[in-house]
Amino acid sequence: NNSNARRDLGVYVVEEPNPRAVPATRSLRFLPVEYPEQEFFPGRKWHFDSEALFVFEEKLYFLTKHRVTGETAAKAGTNLYRLDSNYTDRKNVLTLVGSRTDIVWPTAASVSPDGNSLAILTLDALWLFSKPRVGDDWLSGKLRQIPLPRDRTRQVEAVCWDDLITLRIANEQRDLFSFDLTMVDSPPRGDSKP
């Protein structure tokens, strides 16, 4: 939704394929979605684009990318939404859960295997949030930010956990990076919410 004008946003549900056995997969169903704050197409604020999704407690979450209105340029900020319904015959209105003003263009997100940490990938940093004490506003948890050397990592687009301390990051150029969180010098920050 780069221009924030699409009215046909949605999620394709597929079975998780075995990449070694299945060269292609099919959509099981399509879940149309809409952002509750978007009244105009394109929106007055260009805050209705998302490619960073994650699952927590069997719910799908979306992190938005904000753009300078009328342009494709990145703007700081992200909103966290939750998909609460699974309608196929009408739009599923997303629920706004939280927001931050300092995250620029989240491209991927993943919850740790134990469900206690969320990794959010942006073009120049890896943001690690602890599970919130109450509710599901992950953006309110304790934060640890790890800068990424963009000259090496380039256009990063995917993140996943190998285990509780190792993350894998892939970029658009098909390079794969492994991060051992115990080897990265970036102390956690306390609860802070810009």
Where are the model-predicted features located?
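Sequence/structural signature of beta-propeller domains
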Residues: 1-194
